[in-house]
Amino acid sequence: FCDGPTHQSRRWQLVYGVRGSYGFNLTVYGPNRPLHSGHYGNWSPNPIAMLTELIGSMRATDGRILVDGYHEQVKPLSDAELAAIAASPRMDEVLITDLGIGAPETEDRLELAIARPAMNLRGISGGDVGAKARNAIQPSASASIGLRLVPAQTPEYLREVIENHIRKQGYHIIRAEPTTEQRQQHERLARVNWSSSGGYPAYRASFDNPLAMQISTILGDLSDGTLIQTPTMGGSLPLYVVEDVLKTPILILPVANHDNNQHGADENLRRMLETHSDLLTADLWLFCDGPAHQSRRWQLVYGVRGSYGFNLTVYGPNRPLHSGHYGNWSPNPIAMLTELIGSMR
């Protein structure tokens, strides 16, 4: 697969796996309407404070996930995978400067950090801030939480242990807005809604697979021995589906520039465009595009049709006219256009 950002060193890179993905929206509740924080503060539950405490019970400041049993399924990196990481250039200090951060969350290098399970806070909402801030206790607060899975972890298991953790913090889990009865029966309510897609597991090919070894040798020669081999990419792709069908290892060749602001408002594809421009100078162009043959058999296509087009506009009066007063007298552009098209086709 050709996907994802290249290594920050800009050297050729072969990636053997990706993390899985799952996510959920979490909402906790306080009073059934906004309350004045002076009149009711220190008495009424504050959903924003409750939410931050609940998140803090699940995720440490160094990124470690604190949920009991969360790492039970984790398959550790092999000696060969750890050696490949150790052999790759360490870019942490360069990234710290480039990204303008004081320090990373963890003392581990980036490649080790992204090989672990992750709990990412995608967004959080409650009251307003800045000029719109009010001295009020809000009725609810919400967070969107994304999970990155590593090999052997399953979405179903993680859902179970996370919900068990939330219950241990004293919350009753609901799936919709709370009813009056639920508010009266439970001191703490947490609405948990998991992504409708159901998530998907991680995938990682083995370093000692014969096909993987062959490809790494070829790319190593092409890169003059500077190829970086990475056990897993930090991002996610449902590659397990492809592997289940084809029964063959899946490898990833990153093509985008590492500083492409991926998933940001100004994401760009500079490195990908450079890579494709290099491909256009080759003697053989191979494009993966279009629908497969209707028989579902493998197909090699030797050509495509060309394409051209034009916009055609015809004109009538310089302003709209009443069709009763001017019909059958004024030229009608719609009729004229259909006649002209009919003369061509």
Positions of PLM-derived features:
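Fold-level recognition of mixed alpha/beta catalytic cores in primary-metabolism enzymes, strongest
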Residues: F1-P104, D108-P117, D266-R345
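Active-site helix-to-loop segments that bind/position phosphate- or nucleotide-bearing substrates
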Residues: I145
